[in-house]
Amino acid sequence: MNASELFIKALENEGVEYIFGIPGEENLDFLDALRTSHIKLILTRHEQGAGFMAATYGRLTGKVGVCLSTLGPGATNFATSAAYAQLGGMPMMMITGQKPIKKSKQGRFQIIDIVRMMRPMTKFAKQIVNV
């Protein structure tokens, strides 16, 4: 079992039914693991829309709304919906992609410290490095 499969199992155990978001190179392992899950991926055209859908799902159901994005600019598009969810007390989880800097031929291209950016707008922000 790889890290993505373990993460999907944890989401299933928490009762997650839907994930709103956009596929990208940096979250393909996660999406592959999602293929065998009962959790449904709701594709969106923009990360901000995915964030608002997840926040509103949380508001209406009381269950955690989960949204998914790629790295860098895709992840920063969650900022407004993160603030909206926090101010409204809506349960929401944001999952963003990231790539290892060492393996990237492009260096820091599109790599943003999303954890530090989201801390003021969320209850908890963490990057998973090792499983």
Outline where the language-model segments fall.
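N-terminal alpha/beta PP-like core and its mobile active-site loop of ThDP/TPP-dependent enzymes
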Residues: M1-V131
